[in-house]
Amino acid sequence: MPVLVETIAEFKTGKPFQGMMVGFRLHLEPKTAVLIEALLAGGAEVIAMGNEGTTQFGTAEVLSSQGCEVLDRPGQGPEATAVHLSRVASTGPDLVLDNGAELIGACLDNASPPLGATEETTSGAFRLREDHAGQVGFPVIVINDSPLKSIVENKHGVGESVVDTIVRVTNMSFHKKRVVVYGYGWCGRGIALYAQRRGADVTVVEIDPIKALEAAMDGFDVAEPSVASTTAEVVITATGRPGVVDYPAIEQMPDGVLLANAGHVDTEIDIRQLEQQAPGAELSPSLKRHDLSNGKSVFSIAEGRIVNLAAFGGIGNPIEAMDLGLTLQARSLAALVDP
């Protein structure tokens, strides 16, 4: 990761975060560990938490040995997220590096608000601009708005790693598979592109008419959900919104359909309702079969969590893509301190 390593060298000399506490919420895996190394090199104290299902605990142990306080523990349940958010917010961080805007939200009631924050995701940008509109009294740099991140990390990094992870988890070929991609933002663009490169017949579902037009001009079929889902063999969500594919929609899908989510939130596909109605039988790590009451079978990956990180063996985006995106995070935090 040469760009981030160069940043680390600069931070060691300049110490932009000397004496500051950074609240860190991002997937904890080897690439993001280098970002934490950059913050520590810059003089920061770091208290870190990951996202449910994506923390690599070997990485967490290494970070702890380097002086970063890591809250995640093996075997923790979903309730740990709220506990950890509260714990990080209670330290009164000077800076926040967030992934989903939940940590920023937890800091809004602090007596001393952060100097500023960065937000990594589309989901977090939605939350800030909608749920927290007018409530955030400090600057937030949405890294996802950068064209550098959009093109390099979201389109090509996410697109390549999502399709590659699905192939490895299922051991199936994409050739002539009918793949439906929900969402044609930058991640959806990339997923559609890389699925097509693997030989899939791709249909895009997109509610924004301009993006839907772009998908059509890019050569993809565009259809309403009720039409696209009835022929799908693989469904991949990438919208950053909850409730995109509900259980009634799953019931209408063809027998043998595979469900995977590439968005930040694990509720884009209603896996919880699917599990209640048709508990999954584990076929292999991260892959389940659900036998519906209507006689159909549905397959799901990683319980609806972000597939390229939460699935067994998922290693996230290519290291070159993350080098650029994580450098944007580090340098954006430095810019908030010294604009």
Give a label for each model feature.
Residues 1-4, 21, 29, 138-176, ...:
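Adenosine-phosphate binding glycine-rich loop
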Residues 26-44, 49, 157-160, 164-242:
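Glycine-rich phosphate/diphosphate-binding loop of Rossmann-like nucleotide-binding domains
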Residues 43-45, 68, 112-114, 136-138, ...:
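A short helix->loop->beta-strand "cap" motif at the edges of active sites that frequently abuts
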Residues 88-89, 227-228, 252:
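Structural alpha-helical scaffold elements that stabilize or flank donor/cofactor-binding regions
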